[in-house]
Amino acid sequence: MNNRNVLAVAAALMFGFSALHASAQKDPTVGGAAMYPTKNIVENAVNSKDHTTLVAAVKAAGLVETLEGPGPFTVFAPTNEAFDKLPAGTVDTLLKAENLGTLKKILTYHVVAGKMTSKDIAKKIKMGGGKATLTTVEGGTLTAMMDGGKLVLTDAKGGTSTVTIANVIQSNGVIHVVDTVLMPN
């Protein structure tokens, strides 16, 4: 890659990182509810009308205690609309007792150990030459990239999910709201 191309890529990445980082707010609103940095992931998520499906799934999978714990965690939180994109009946099937192992695997695939703000992810993307690999609590990986100023995650099956609200700071980590459910292998 010649110097001009390197500079163009660097400028595009820096613009994207700046736009993403600027989306961070003090006590942002998610799903019509203020998110407080003094509350944990579960305490905040239960108040978001956009995350009722996620909260129900977390409860069914027995992950409430974990996500109320000290962490820190980075959670890529799918909205109700993200779950609605799944084939009809998928959520109901996953919530059945015999499928809770699969549900837990999908949910923990949305969690990365540690607190990673958009700025932290942007640094990893820059250091990775335009891509960053994030290892999830489930054990799989997500690929993070910038696309026109937006942070996009690619899952193990090649599906993509865009961060729509970044840097929702919690007492035990950070939430990034995403528009599509990510799928592990």
Predicted features, each with a name:
Residues M1-V9:
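Bacterial N-terminal signal peptides that target proteins for export
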